[in-house]
Every structure is written in structure tokens, then in C-alpha cells.
A protein has these predicted regions:
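General structural signal for secondary-structure boundaries
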Residues: 1-2, 9, 66, 97, ...
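Active-site nucleotide-donor binding segment shared across nucleotidyl transfer reactions
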Residues: 45-98
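Conserved catalytic core of two-metal-ion nucleotidyltransferases
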Residues: 107-152
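N-terminal regions immediately upstream of nucleotidyltransferase
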Residues: 2-46
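Short, conserved charged micro-motifs
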Residues: 98-105
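Short linear motifs embedded in intrinsically disordered, charge-biased segments
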Residues: 4, 21-23, 33-34, 86, ...
Length: 199
């Protein structure tokens, strides 16, 4: 601030250590890794996507995972753009994550989906609060998180619907946190790929 560079050396040393032990690259990085796989029937895709998006918009959630990357890919070249699919792949920030997860479950059940489960995952210190995983059959379609601070986002209008999409710095801060947490339900290569793509 105000031209003060006294902390730059300390920051640079920390950044060098971070890059040494957690480099922002993955040898297995392919565009297919950006999104979670989906083994459900193809006709389920649009119903799940539309249901999750409608609830997220209605509850003013912020998108920051696979779907957000899918939207950002539209600003990339055609080769990159064509690598993305419409697989149900959502990470949401919600003021009331438990309620949001249960609404997704209820609305999908109203559309005749079966075997929908919600898994609660514990938070970590003051960095990550409890969060909820929505699973349809064997496919994880959505994680819902509670914000731990004010997070910046952009509003993107698509067909008169306003989507709150996390800014790149917000997305990267979550992705890096997920890498360090080393939870079994996070695919590190996938997270590194998404981070590389945004960076």
C-alpha cells in the first residue's frame, strides 16, 4: 500500500515455497479433466442442469466450479470451447447451504429422479465451513458451500437470467484451499487443471 515494498521479499519467499511444493501444473491435465464425469442417462443432463441452475439463481448462489469454468470457456478460442461438455457439475456458494442442497434434492425428486443422497462434509478450522454433496445415483452433481467471507463475483446475463459467477481470484482461492485440504472427494488433478486454465 502507498508504495510500501518492505514486505515484497517475504511475500516472494513464500510464493517461491508455494510454487516449489504445490506447483500450479498437472502432467495429467486435459480439458476432459475440468469437469466431473457423469454416468447417468444423457436425457438426465438437461433436467439436472436446469433444476440446479434455477434453484441457484433463485437463491442468489454464486457459481464457482465446473459450470463457472464452462461459462468462462465461452470467452476462449474455439478449440478450448469445444472441449467442454454440459455434464452436471456445480459448486455453489449459498448463505444456507443445507437448505439449498435439500431443495435441489426435492426438486429433482419432483422430476421423478430416484436415489438422491446428500452427504454432509465437515469444515476445516475457520477456512471452510461444513458443506454438502448432492449425489444422483453414483454421480456427484453438486457441492454447496457456505461463504466464509465476502467473495467477489460477476453477474452474467444469459437469456434474461442473471447468473452470479465467481471472479477468477475467488475461484482460485477456493481451488488452492481444496488442494491443501487433501480431502478424498477432491480430485487434485482436476482442481490443478481448472486453476491452470484460469491462471
Amino acid at each position: 500500500p502507498k508504495g510500501d515494498i518492505s514486505r515484497w521479499e517475504k511475500v516472494m519467499k513464500r510464493a517461491a515455497l508455494l510454487n516449489k511444493y504445490y506447483p500450479l501444473n498437472s502432467e495429467k491435465c486435459k480439458y476432459e479433466n475440468f469437469q466431473r464425469s457423469f454416468e447417468g442417462k444423457p436425457e438426465y443432463v438437461d433436467v439436472i442442469n436446469n433444476t440446479v441452475k434455477a434453484i441457484a439463481v433463485r437463491e442468489q448462489c454464486i457459481f464457482f466450479g465446473g459450470y463457472a469454468n464452462y461459462l468462462y470457456s465461452k470467452y476462449m478460442n474455439k478449440t478450448v470451447k469445444n472441449k467442454f461438455s454440459k455434464h452436471p457439475d456445480f459448486d455453489l456458494l449459498s448463505i444456507h447451504p443445507k437448505e439449498t442442497a435439500h431443495r435441489i434434492k426435492e426438486e429433482l425428486e419432483n422430476s421423478d429422479f430416484k436415489n438422491i443422497t446428500i452427504k454432509k462434509h465437515d469444515g476445516f478450522m475457520d477456512l471452510l465451513k461444513s458443506h454438502y454433496e448432492v449425489i444422483v445415483n453414483k454421480d456427484t452433481i453438486c457441492f454447496v458451500y457456505e461463504p466464509i467471507a465476502c467473495h467477489s463475483y460477476n453477474v452474467i446475463k444469459i437469456k434474461d437470467i442473471r447468473y452470479r459467477i465467481a471472479t477468477i481470484d475467488t475461484m482460485l482461492s477456493f481451488y488452492l484451499l481444496f488442494i491443501y485440504l487433501d480431502k478424498p472427494y477432491y480430485n487434485i488433478d482436476r482442481i490443478l487443471c481448472m486453476s491452470q486454465f484460469l491462471f
